[in-house]
Amino acid sequence: MPYNNETHNEQMRSQRRPTAARQKANPNWQSTQERRQAASQSDESLQYSRNASRYAARERELRNKRRTRVAALSCVVIISLCALCFGAAKVLTTVPSTNEPISNEQQTQQPSIFAKEEQTTPQPNDDPGDIVIGVNGDTDTYVIRGEEYIEGGAHAASPNHGVLTPSIETSGSVDSNTEGDYTITYTARDSEGHTAKAERTVHVVDSMDTMKTGVPVLMYHYVYDESNPPSDLNGNWIVDTKLDEHMQYLNDNGFYYPSFPEVQAFIEGKHSLPAKSVVLTFDDGEDGTLGFLDALSSKHHIPVTSFMICSDQTAAANKVAKYASPYVQFESHSISMHQPGGTIGHGGRISAMTKDEILEDLRNSAAVVGSDQAFAYPFGDTTPDGQKAVSEAGLNCAFTTKNDWCYIGDDVTALNRVRISGEYSIDSFIYLVNEQ
């Protein structure tokens, strides 16, 4: 329908009429308006009722939560108070009154913090750090029932802490009158509290095959790699593969490796050694040789001894630490005797020294290597004063270069050794180490 402006204006004016006009124009308007207002009031009442119910429910929920929190907090407070009371009671029962003496048992129950405050030295731990420790001689020692067990000792060193042998502690005991196996434990500690241990198993047996007349102490000098021979190659050198062959033969044939205290007791007729006993020694402590000794002795688990020249005491001590091995024991080859100046034998300086000078040398060189069980005379030269000094120094054995076995009844201050040359065949080696 086309737009009629007059009609539109009339409708607008009708909407703006006062209430009386609307009532006149529409007699039912009032009742309709009242119904709308009543309905609106009813809706508002219903809405208020609903809101009131929701508010009440929310209030109840909040009150319940507050009660729960209060209850939980109360429990925490009660538990804390109980724990505090329990701790106080424990302290009161642990720490004695100052008027009462503290028993040994109570002292051991003191909290660790007190022990740390009183501690003056590092506590040992199970971490060995860089300590290397090994048993002197065979780790399986044999004793005939009724004979005395001879303690062979152990050796230890650390690249960072040097020689540790003098501080080794020995524990365990052997009843040599009762057959069985016994364990001796050696413990070395450094200044940082690191602890390393080695064990010896002592077998007390009713009987065994023994050495009858003597024992071979082998004398080697230097070891070299076949691909890099020394320029001054001579009989004092042995190629590493041949030394490896020697060690393999000894192990394959069940040889036993006695300690120097055992050798001394055997030579003096006080102790039996198992059949096929042998001692391996290497003179001078040359760097390359020490590297081979560490590798080969560890490979075959054969103990060997390096007689170290200690003229440069710092360098010698550093070698002991650098080449520390469970299977390499370091002993003295003197500080000032490995040089010419004497008038006997090979012209070694020992014959120009007094007994006291020799004794001082022995003690100082033993301190460098950390052990005083054995000594090798430089150039094999010895004198009566030298032998007296060895005895006064308390060494178990001292060795010359006289080419022979050590026999029962020999003088332990001047024992023989069997020279091993790199030029010898394996058959010659076998002949030299076996008792005929």
Range-by-range predicted roles:
Residues 213-237, 274-278, 286-385, 411-415, ...:
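Metal-dependent polysaccharide deacetylase catalytic core of the NodB/CE4 family, i.e.
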Residues 238-272, 313, 391-436:
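C-terminal domain-boundary segment and adjacent tail
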Residues 201-209:
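Short beta-strand edge segments in extracellular beta-sheet folds
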Residues 161-200:
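Serine/threonine-rich, repeat-prone extracellular segments and beta-strand-based repeat modules
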Residues 1-63:
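N-terminal targeting leaders characterized by basic, low-complexity, disordered sequences
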Residues 111-161:
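Solvent-exposed, low-complexity, repeat-rich "mucin-like" stalks and linkers
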Residues 85-101:
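Hydrophobic single-pass membrane-insertion segments
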Residues 60-78:
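N-terminal Sec-pathway targeting helices
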